[in-house]
């Protein structure tokens, strides 16, 4: 049996990307952002098509993502942050709630959101992961933005089946 398969598309030309970056654990978050923006540029996304917004911490990321999603100006969003375990339960709370909120934005608004909020046991782990995770977030955002467009076109193709010429004139 032969099946259709979508090939990943990492061409960022013309894509508009919104980035929300936490300022808490700032050196790590800046490293994430630098790697992410560098990779977006390598993939063909221009600086004028990227908006970087900073927020105090990981718990504030979902609201900023929501506002960007509501604007309708972006093809994909990226969340950047670092939650590093301390000696209290706060780590679990921040990790779980920020992750849940980020996922909810993607589903509620139908927009790809690449989640690069690191959750690590210590500073060393965060520093070791920040560059590759920043790059990965850029690739994920571009790939998913292109996939979303391709899948939306599938939906449009199904709507066209069986329509007459009158329907085509209405869309023109």
From Swiss-Prot:
Residues annotated for 5-amino-6-(D-ribitylamino)uracil binding in this entry: 24, 58-60, 82-84, 115
Transferase keyword on record: yes
Biased composition range(s): Acidic residues: 154-172
CDD domains named in the record: Lumazine_synthase-I
GO biological process terms on file: riboflavin biosynthetic process
Family matches, as Gene3D superfamilies: Lumazine/riboflavin synthase
Catalytic activity: (2S)-2-hydroxy-3-oxobutyl phosphate + 5-amino-6-(D-ribitylamino)uracil = 6,7-dimethyl-8-(1-D-ribityl)lumazine + phosphate + 2 H2O + H(+)
Pathway(s) it belongs to: Cofactor biosynthesis; riboflavin biosynthesis; riboflavin from 2-hydroxy-3-oxobutyl phosphate and 5-amino-6-(D-ribitylamino)uracil: step 1/2
Record's function text: Catalyzes the formation of 6,7-dimethyl-8-ribityllumazine by condensation of 5-amino-6-(D-ribitylamino)uracil with 3,4-dihydroxy-2-butanone 4-phosphate. This is the penultimate step in the biosynthesis of riboflavin.
Name used for this protein in its record: 6,7-dimethyl-8-ribityllumazine synthase
Organism, scientific name: Paraburkholderia phymatum (strain DSM 17167 / CIP 108236 / LMG 21445 / STM815) (Burkholderia phymatum)
Species lineage: Bacteria, Pseudomonadati, Pseudomonadota, Betaproteobacteria, Burkholderiales
